[in-house]
Amino acid sequence: MRGPLPSTREIYKNALNVAWPSAAESVLVSLVGSVDTMMVGGLGPVAIAAVGLTNQPKFVLLALIMSLNVGVTTVVARRKGQQNQEGAQKCLRVALMISFGLALILSTLGYLFAEPIMQFSGAQPDVMEDSVAYFRIIMMGFVPMCIGLTINAAQRGVGNTRISMTTNMTSNIINLIFNYLLIHGKMGFPRLEVRGAALATILGSTVACLLSIRSVLKADTYLKLSIKDHWGMDRE
């Protein structure tokens, strides 16, 4: 026998609870690039243009991962509604393998073809060197960024929306601190300029990824991962 249908207000409330963390995550992810652009402003217009030109191709690549993550959130939420914890964990394992493989391919292609990608984005000769260097360093940290986003998407599916905010806020704070230290060479750190901004970004995303991984290694969490789990693909 089926239970009573939820009211319209409850439907909108549930939809909002699922949607706003995803929207907030997108804003925080884009904020990293904006912060980099602002903080290299002291280096001159060439540095600003070099960093700004990389944002569009980076988000084109991220859009593929985020499209996968929409499905991850939906399937994990469905498995939890069915009281199928193992099914939810299996979905996360499969999603992580796909996310890792896809991110590895995309980051490798992005690194190898950074120069033509920047040319297509409109980079002029005077900004080409800095934009290619920045984009290649960002691609080196693309895999942990995508792994973290996929885990966060699965956590949203089981109602744990706090992890997305925590990891992305941490990423932005670390990026901000190391931008200050590495762009202009403060407090004994080397002056790396545009490359320093890129290194700060991947450092922040790597720490965020580690926090996301830690969230699924806890014994008291709904989504738990272990090396001993079955990580193979199946038809189910």
Predicted segments, located by residue:
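Small-residue-rich hydrophobic transmembrane alpha-helices
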Residues: T37, I48-Y111, M145-S164
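Transmembrane alpha-helix boundary and packing residues in multipass membrane permease domains
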Residues: S22, S26, T37-M38, T74, ...
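Hydrophobic transmembrane alpha-helices of multi-pass small-molecule transporters
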Residues: V60-A63, N175-N179, C209-I213
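Short hydrophobic/small-residue motifs within alpha-helical transmembrane segments
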Residues: F142-C146, T170
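Residue-level signal for short hydrophobic patches within transmembrane helices
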Residues: Y12-L31, V35, P57-L64, M140, ...
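Alpha-helical transmembrane segments of multi-pass membrane transporters/permeases
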Residues: S99, A154-L181, R195-A198
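Short alpha-helical transmembrane segments in multi-pass integral membrane proteins
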Residues: M1-S22, V76-V143, F189-E236
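Helix-terminus/linker motif at the lipid-water interface of multi-pass membrane proteins
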Residues: L31-A49, M118-P125, L181-L192
